Amino acid sequence: MLEQALITHCAPTLARLKPGGMFALAGVDGAAMEREMRSLNRLLLPKGVVLTVLRRCGQSTLFYLYRPCELRAILESEAARAFLRRCGYADFAPEAALRVLRARLGEGEGFPHEIGIFLGYPLADVIGFIRNGGRNCLLCGHWKVYSDAVGAARKFARYRKCKEVYARLFQSGCPLSRLTVGAKPA
């Protein structure tokens, strides 16, 4: 079940086009899901990818698939740090930042807007979304774009193509291990 969801919702992260992806599943058996997550992480970790839970709410579970090295690079950006400090973050190691994000997700029904940083959205678009209350965007795709519409449109097209190719390959029997691109060499 989780493998199919990863292909459907996180193909660009598996393909190393995005630092992170997120999806929710409802009605998931907790113990079975934990076993499947452990099994998937044994497969994904050597390739520099981690699957974790951000929030459980009733029968729904919010998952986050990410590349820690790429998230670390984003969190090392001084602009991202300044923004996240204003949101209550003090430690910018990926796991520490994820702990704060999990806590903020647990505070209410909605998503804290900084979640876009963890998904690889441009900081200018995250800030634009907040300033405009989600209105007046230049382009709407994987996220609402407020800065570079041309560059974002190119990314959206790459993500769309990636999802199509990954879905086709997975349906034809290609295993997740082959569809997960390894981490960049250090």
Predicted regions and their residues:
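A glycine-rich, hydrophobic loop/mini-helix early in the fold
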Residues: 36-95
